[in-house]
Amino acid sequence: MEGLTVGRIVHFVIREWDANRINRRRTNSESIKERMAHNEWNLGAQAHIGTSVEEGEEYPMIIVKVLDKERGVVRGQVFLDGNDVYWVEAIYSHQDEPLPGSWHWVERE
């Protein structure tokens, strides 16, 4: 696949499974405050805070490893609307009709 290199930014389409994992690990400031008041928050723990994620939403992803250049299979870090990222592996390209769990090139205007 022409142009497929480490460091390239593409779009990743969120699957329901991804959305559930991301949303489950996220918290908010009120929850943290409550847990800290009762010594239920581990000192030094990183809180994942951000907007809710849904299946079909697209987020920028930086390619961190090309597994199969010919078939467009990659691993990447998805940049979410929050203070966290999400690692995906063995993700295939689907350029014609972006499907959940696939990546595609960023559209140019």
Where does each model-flagged region fall?
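Short beta-strand-centered aromatic/proline hotspots
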Residues: 21-36, 51-67
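Glycine-aromatic-enriched surface loops/turns that form tight recognition elements
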Residues: 25-35, 42-44, 49, 93-101, ...
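Intrinsically disordered, low-complexity boundary segments flanking structured domains
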Residues: 1, 45-51, 63
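Residue-level signal for functionally critical sites in structured catalytic/ligand-binding pockets
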Residues: 5-8, 27
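Intrinsically disordered, low-complexity, charged/polar segments
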Residues: 52-59, 64-109
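Short intrinsically disordered terminal tails
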Residues: 1-4, 108-109
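Generic alpha-helix signal with a bias toward terminal, lower-confidence helices
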Residues: 16, 22-26, 75, 90
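Short, charged beta-turn/beta-strand-edge "cap" motif at the junction between a beta-strand
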Residues: 1-2, 9, 13-20
